[in-house]
Curated annotation (Swiss-Prot):
Keywords linked to the UniProt accession: Methyltransferase, Ribosome biogenesis, RNA-binding, rRNA processing, rRNA-binding, S-adenosyl-L-methionine, Transferase
Domain of life, source organism: Archaea
PANTHER family: NEP1/MRA1, RIBOSOMAL RNA SMALL SUBUNIT METHYLTRANSFERASE NEP1
Family membership: Belongs to the class IV-like SAM-binding methyltransferase superfamily. RNA methyltransferase NEP1 family.
Name assigned to this protein: Ribosomal RNA small subunit methyltransferase Nep1
Gene of this entry: nep1
Pfam families the record matches: EMG1
Gene3D superfamilies named in the record: 3.40.1280.10
Residues at the site labelled Interaction with substrate rRNA: R59, R100, K103, N107
Quaternary data: Homodimer.
Length: 221
C-alpha cells in the first residue's frame, strides 16, 4: 500500500506573513528567520487571518501524527508500505521505511525545518527523508497514474474487502484539517472512493484504520 497524504497542511511561513509581529516574535524566540520556521496555527493563529485557504493550513501536527502511525506499523516494517507527503506549495516528501520519526512534536518540527533548509535528512550520507518540488498530479503519475481515495463521500466496504482493495493500491488521503481537496480531479479521476465508517475522522484515524485493514489482508494480524 502506498499512502499519499495530499494537500497536507505543512509549509514554512509564507513571505506575506514574515513581518507580522506574531511571526517575528516566534522566529526571534527560536533564533531563526521568519521564513525558516513552520507555519503552525497553534502559535500563529493571529497572523493567519488574512491568509488564503487559512482553514486548511498551518497544521504540521497532522503530518506528524500520520507519520507516527505509518512508520511504526507492521505494514511498513515488513516492507509492504510506502508513504509520500504532498504539501502546501506543491512539495513532496518521501520517507524511507526505516526512518524513525521523532515522537516529540517539537523535535519533529525541527526535523521538518531542517528538511526544508537542506532538501534531505540527514544532510550527508544516505538520505532517510527527501524533499522535492513536485505537484500532486506529477507524483500520482509517477506512482502509476491510478489511485483510490479514502473520503467521507465514498462507498463503505466490509473491513476485510477494504483491506484487500487497499493493500496493492495507491491510497490518497487528505492531509488538511477542514474543507475538501482543492484539486477536484483527485476525486473525479480516482479508480474508486471508499470511506471508513459513517463518522468523519481526522487523517491519522483514517490512516490507522487503512493500515490495519491492509495488515489483515496481508495476513500480518
Amino acid at each position: 500500500m502506498i499512502v499519499v497524504l495530499a494537500e497536507s497542511a505543512l509549509e514554512l511561513v509564507p513571505r506575506e506573513l514574515w513581518n507580522h509581529p506574531v511571526i517575528q516574535a516566534d522566529a526571534k524566540r527560536r533564533g531563526k528567520k521568519p521564513g525558516e520556521i513552520l507555519l503552525d496555527r497553534a502559535r500563529h493563529h493571529l497572523a493567519m487571518s488574512s491568509l488564503r485557504d487559512a482553514s486548511k493550513r498551518g497544521r504540521p501536527d497532522i503530518v506528524h501524527q500520520v507519520l507516527l502511525v505509518f512508520q511504526y506499523s507492521l505494514l511498513n516494517k515488513r516492507g509492504l508500505g510506502r508513504i509520500y507527503i504532498h504539501t502546501q506549495g506543491d512539495y513532496t516528501i518521501y520517507v524511507r521505511w526505516e526512518t524513525r520519526i521523532p515522537k516529540n512534536y517539537n523535535n519533529f518540527v525541527s526535523l521538518m525545518e531542517q528538511l526544508y533548509a537542506t532538501g534531505r535528512v540527514p544532510p550527508k550520507g544516505e538520505p532517510l527523508i527527501e524533499l522535492y518540488k513536485k505537484d500532486l498530479s506529477t507524483l500520482l503519475r509517477e506512482l502509476g497514474g491510478r489511485w483510490v481515495v479514502l473520503h467521507e463521500s465514498g462507498v463503505k466496504k466490509p473491513f476485510i474487502e477494504l483491506g484487500a482493495a487497499l493493500l496493492n493500491s495507491v491510497v490518497v488521503i487528505g492531509g488538511f484539517p477542514h474543507g475538501d481537496f482543492t484539486n477536484k480531479w483527485v476525486l473525479e479521476k480516482a479508480d474508486a472512493i471508499y470511506k471508513i465508517g459513517d463518522e468523519t475522522m481526522d487523517a491519522a484515524q483514517v490512516v490507522y484504520r487503512a493500515i490495519t485493514a491492509a495488515e489483515v489482508a496481508a495476513g500480518l494480524l
